[in-house]
Amino acid sequence: MAEAGKQQDFPSTIDIPLAGMHLSRGTTATLDQRYVNVLFELYTNPLTGGKSLMAVKRPGLAQFSQPPAGAATGRGLYAWAGSGKIYSVFNNKIYSNTTDLGVTLAASTGRVWFAETSPTSTERILIISDGTDNYHITTADVITQIDEVDDPQYPQNNLGPVLFYDDYIVQAQSDGEIWNTEPDNFTSWTSLNVISSAMYGDELEAIVRLKDQIMAMGKQSIEFFFNNGTSNSPFLRIDQNSLQLGLATKNSLSFAGESIMWVASTPAVGGGSRQVWLIEGSRQGKRVSTPALERILNAETITSCTAWMETIAGHLIYVLNLATSGRTWVYDVSIGMWTEWKTASDAIFPGMAATSVDGQVYVQDATNGRIYTLNPTTYQDNGSNFTVTIQTDNYDFGTPMAKFQSGLWLLGDNTTGTINVSESDDDYVTFNTARTIDMTVTHKFLAEGGMFFQRAYRFEYTQNAALRLQKFSLKLEVGVG
């Protein structure tokens, strides 16, 4: 016999995935659906073709080295196969592993940029640019500072990004001039070896290589150049490829392999709106930011951001640190989804640059002078537990009637300790006192749950252990009035 006051045609058990999209209604960090300190993994059944999306705890940080032996501002990191060493810049010093190479950079602040010549070049060197001077490092760690004293036609006050392209070193200036050295002569600059990006009236912000082309990225436009083999400047613009889409700041620009990502300024849609864009190889570029993220980007002092790209545990990720809002956003190129990363103290993720050697990712801290390893089998950040937080949308389950929850089941791998589960029935204003689910057992269950009209769920896990979750299930009944 039916229980009085309850609907009988409502599904008794409802499954809710624990992976999805951030749904922030504004710039507040704590409201709405959010996924913190996870990556998503997509699994496909080869027999049925069925797919399941799981939330997996992000990799953790462990200290690898501290080249300056104390707190210092991180400015760039690069692993060079030519010497088998990791090069870093902290404050105004260059380090080879932990050895200070004994020069003081001309520009004492801002991101530095790296390029390496080919093993078949006359001179195999690593080039570091701070936007004022270049620093050429040999495989024996002999360093030479290059500026207008060495060559009066050296492009002073350049943008910083330095490229190696077909035996040329290429740099650019904000007025749109793109300079190249003489072929296979990396200290010889002449005023004839210049071409300008001049289709639009905006200033140049950065250059980056995409396969066999150079992208000249202005603040509101992008032009493409290729090696046409002409004398002086060998580059020729591909007019039909130009885009009325700019680069909001070069600090957001990052690349790995044939993938390039950046925060774009988009005058074509009015108001200079900011979006995150991705170009992969020869494919057409695409916008990958969500409306929720774009609201945050448009409220940000974007020039203070940092960004990097690396592959970790099978995920090619773009990590965007927004200093003004104190938040770190991570885009997984493999599956096209965003998550958010935080530290144990609920602060911005500390890594401002990254590099990798033989599958091991290294991350440079923004302020403390340290270099960390980033590893999927490390479940802390430098010895401190950080919290995985999954907060769901505010569900009414398709009806305004009262709902009665009689059980909650969590589907995920067995692991260490407990996970906290709490609910909000007042649009995220308050959450009730968390109950715990034992993650060491197969049957992960909470009894009862009371009555609600709309409810959001929050799962928090702070153990020094792995975590992989797929979904949770609710047993609900609905009132009739």
Model-inferred region functions:
Residues A2-G102, A106-I125, S242-I260, S265-G481:
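Beta-sheet repeat architectures centered on beta-propellers
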Residues N97, I137-T139, E177-N185, S422-D425:
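Conserved Ser/Thr-centered positions that define the repeating blades of beta-propeller domains
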Residues T98-D100, T138-D141, D184-N185, N228-T230, ...:
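Short loop/turn segments that connect beta-strands within beta-propeller blades
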